């Protein structure tokens, strides 16, 4: 558990205690351990995640990451539930394993619109990636609870960050790497607001579960 092992309970409202990069490394190390188990077929190990974990799922397929950590790691498939797609990778080389994004039309925490551009760009580069947008659904559409509001959480609806091949995330306007918590807070000031809605949609919940069973 990438949170518990670091004594972190939540990244809501800050997004800097545990990074996507750190959890991707955790995922690769977990793959390496699982692949040595005599009862596990390394060619059938897939990855899925939600929100921040969805970002981990998505970018664990990014070849610059794969090449930097372990080129022998290859997930069978990547299923990302409402990931942050508001990154524009300088290098758009991704794994040829199937990648699929499930996201809500009304998501204002990790908005769907950047995912459309992200998927289109990768498809044009022959990536095996697809997107499902659930109509009338918010972040956490697969929860079994009504939609509520969190006034403290970051709303990324107006953000689109550049991602260099070296893995640096650049501020929207200054092109300065957000390489520490201070610079990240500074970068967020240009586009992030507070307040998001999240909660379940019964139709999207059942549909996403059925899709996951087939895809994984």
Model-predicted segments: where are they?
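Short beta-strand/loop motif that positions the catalytic acidic residue
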Residues: 95, 100-103, 107, 134
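Short alpha-helix in the alpha/beta-hydrolase fold that links the catalytic acid
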Residues: 110-121, 146
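Primarily recognizes the serine-hydrolase "nucleophile elbow" in alpha/beta-hydrolase
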Residues: 18-96, 108, 113
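Acidic catalytic loop of the alpha/beta-hydrolase fold
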Residues: 106-110, 139-140
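C-terminal catalytic histidine-bearing segment of alpha/beta-hydrolase fold enzymes
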Residues: 128-216
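Short aromatic-enriched loop/helix-cap "lid" or pocket-rim segments at secondary-structure transitions
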Residues: 10-11, 92, 142-147
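Short beta-to-alpha linker loops that shape the active-site pocket of alpha/beta-hydrolase fold enzymes
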Residues: 1-5, 84, 137
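Serine-hydrolase catalytic machinery in alpha/beta-hydrolase-like enzymes
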Residues: 1-37, 189-197
């Amino acid at each position: 558990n990438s949170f518990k092992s670091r004594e972190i309970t939540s990244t809501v409202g800050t997004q800097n205690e545990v990074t996507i990069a750190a959890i991707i490394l955790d995922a690769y190390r977990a793959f390496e351990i699982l692949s040595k188990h005599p009862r596990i077929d390394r060619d059938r190990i897939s990855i899925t995640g939600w929100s921040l974990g969805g970002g981990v799922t998505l970018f664990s397929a990014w070849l610059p990451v794969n090449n930097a950590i372990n080129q022998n790691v290859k997930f069978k498939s990547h299923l990302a539930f409402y990931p942050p797609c508001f990154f524009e990778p300088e290098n758009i080389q991704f794994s040829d394993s199937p990648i699929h994004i499930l996201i809500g039309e009304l998501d204002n925490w990790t908005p769907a619109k950047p995912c459309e551009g992200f998927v289109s760009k990768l498809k044009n580069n022959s990536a095996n990636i697809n997107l499902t947008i659930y109509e009338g659904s918010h972040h956490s559409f697969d929860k079994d609870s009504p939609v509520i509001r969190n006034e403290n959480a970051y709303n990324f609806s107006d953000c689109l960050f550049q991602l260099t091949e070296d893995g640096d995330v650049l501020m929207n306007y200054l092109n300065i790497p957000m390489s520490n918590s201070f610079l990240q807070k500074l970068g967020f000031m240009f586009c992030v607001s507070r307040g998001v809605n999240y909660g379940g949609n019964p139709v999207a919940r059942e549909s996403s579960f059925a899709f996951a069973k087939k895809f994984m």
